[in-house]
Structure formats: structure tokens, C-alpha cells
UniProtKB/Swiss-Prot annotation:
Belongs to the peptidase S8 family. The keyword Signal applies. It is found in: Secreted. The active site is at D162 (charge relay system), H193 (charge relay system), S348 (charge relay system). Residues 36-119 form the Inhibitor I9 domain. It comes from the Eukaryota. It comes from Arthroderma gypseum (strain ATCC MYA-4604 / CBS 118893). Glycans are attached at N254, N390, N398. This is Subtilisin-like protease 9. Residues 19-120 form a propeptide. GO terms for cellular component: extracellular region. Secreted subtilisin-like serine protease with keratinolytic activity that contributes to pathogenicity.
Amino acid sequence: MGFFRILFSLSLCALSLAIPSKLIGLENTKDVIPNSYIVVMKSAVSEAEFQSHQAWASKIHSRSLGKRDGVLDDFGGLKATFQFEGLKGYSGAFDKKTIELITRNPAVDYVEVDRVVKLDAISTQRDAPSWGLGRISHRRVGSADYVFDDSAGSGITIYGVDTGIDIRHPEFGGRAAWGTNTVDDEDTDQNGHGTHTAGTFGGATYGIAKKANIVAVKVLNAQGTGTTSGVIQGIQWCTDHAGRNGLRGKAAMNLSLGIRGSTIFNRVAEAAQASGIFLAVAAGNDGTDAGQFSPASARGVCTAAATNSQDAATSWSNYGSVVAVYGPGADIVSAYPNDDTATLSGTSMASPHVCGVGAYLMALEGIGPDTVCDRIKQLASESVTNQKPNTTKKLLYNGSGA
């Protein structure tokens, strides 16, 4: 399914006994990145204190390496910082003694282990017909026509935080630009997932917000893998870019990825939403409660579950009270790298439908990111079948009147 997951691997029993309780994320045991951590500072820490703490952390890291005769191994030290309103911290690779000292530092709120981001299995069918656009612009099943206002997301910028985007694809007509890359040195989409999601939220043929500007933010590589800390860096870049370019209040972000139970991921998503960017996120493809995943369970984001062409919730879509709305997610055709198309399935496909409608409504109605998800829920059709208990029946609708 088209959904990215951040999970754990490696036994951490000995580590959990040695390091204070402020180190979180030890309850899972799949795909942890050895010796890699995300350090979150207490909210009262000033900028000067944050800088001082970084210098201190680098010093004790160097001292620890000195005791190891300068052997670097996997301990590269402080790698990147992040700062949102009321939330700051850094990521890095540290040995056991160093991370124990960092965790005990009174300026530190908590430390979370870093994890690998993976691409779930994707089903691909070349050049198949799509149905999602017709479905979100009609109250009833069956129409192949997409009915929409000509504003079509004009003036809104959408950040695709994913595997990158083939910005030269004809679907984007020069509206797509490269933003940043936190995972490798290849500034293109070598996987296809990111181009596909961008085609859904903003493509000329397969997209919803056909006049929106699109920015590629690559956080996952050709194999569909990255890190929690890398995704945080990507989101940080988006909020900074929106601030520098006067886009806060006129921007949306698609996150077709997730992690099981991450405090820091939820907080970063909430901070990005609060900064003036509408966030649409995938519920996940585990057929379980989306409340167990982040950022699906973050406050204020618009979490999307998936339906098929007959309005039935798919068996693999996550569900639960955190789901805001269902969107088309099975057999969705969209753009693919090298001027191609592909058909993919997953909540990764439902999320860009929600993101695209969010951008469309922001342009059409002049509403802000903080009210977009409520407006989406208000417009939605109560037509989803086969959904699990404690889950909405709301199906995405753009308000076209058809």
C-alpha cells in the first residue's frame, strides 16, 4: 500500500536499564537506527541557552570519543537542529555514555530514539482509468466527470513531503519547484510515490488543485526509506520557507507517511499546522486504529482514511476516532516519473485528495489552515460503508453542487 511507516528494530533492553526514563520510544523493537536520537528541549529554554547546550553536547561527545581513541564508529555527534514555536531540539548519533548525560541534562525535556522510514508495498497498474476526481465532486457514486471552480487552488502553495517530485513532468506545467532534500544527494524522485501524490493534489490532469504551486521536499530515498529526524528537517524547511515567502495562511502540506506512537512527530506536525500550513496526513494501511500512529493522531491535522470506488472503507485502511474524513485510495491513477502514469493504492493516495481539496477550498473560500479540516468535514457526504466502529462515515466532497 502507498503509505510510509516509521518503525523500530534492535533489542534495547540493556540500554533502557542504563538511561533515565526521559528516553522514550523503547517500547517497540523494529527498525531503530543504532545510536541515533532526537533530543527535545524544555519549552522554557531560551535561544542562548539552546546554543550553549549544543556546545556542551558537542564537547562531551568529543570527550567521549577521545576516551575511545578517536574511533568514530557510528557516533557522528550533533547533526541537525529544529525550531518551531514552543518546540526546539536536535538530532544526532551518540554513544551510550554521551546520550545518558544528555538525557540527564536539566534543559532536556525528553529524548526519542530515531527510526527508519519505510515504504509499504505498492500495487502498480500502468495507464488504468481513475475515478477519484469524479467521486469527490459528486454526491453519488458513478460520475467520471470532475466538477470544480476555475480558481482551482490558485495562490496556494502545496508542500509534498515525500520521495521527491519529478518537477519536469508535464502534469505540473512549470508550477512545481524543488525545495530541499534531507535524505540523499539525488534531487529527483527515484521512487515514484512523491510524484504520484503530487499529481493527485496538484496535477493538471489527475489533480484537484490544478493551479496551485507545488514544492518538492524529499525525505525518503529511492527505496522509500529515510529517518524520523530527516522528516522533521523536511517539515522544518517547509515552515521556514512559508515564513520567508509570506505563504503562511496560504499553504498546505501532504504527509503520506507515519510512525507508531511518536511524541516528537506529533508535536512537530502540530507546530507546522499552528504556523499557518494546512496538514493532510495518511491514516495508515495496517487495518487498525490510526490513533496508534503519528502524525495521524496529532491534534489539528486532517487524517485521511481510504475508500474504494463504491464508497466502501478498504480492509487495509486504518480507522478510528482520529480519522477526519475518507478519501479515494484504491486504484488511483496519477503522474509517475519520466512523463509516465501509474495506479497505486493506499491511504497515501487518500491523503493527497484531502490535501488538494483543502488547497482548493482555501483559494475558493478564502479560509485559513486552522479551519480547513472543519470545512472539509462540514461539506463531506455521509456515504462511507463498511467502516469500523468509532469511525466517521464522511467521504470527501469539494462542494461543487453536483
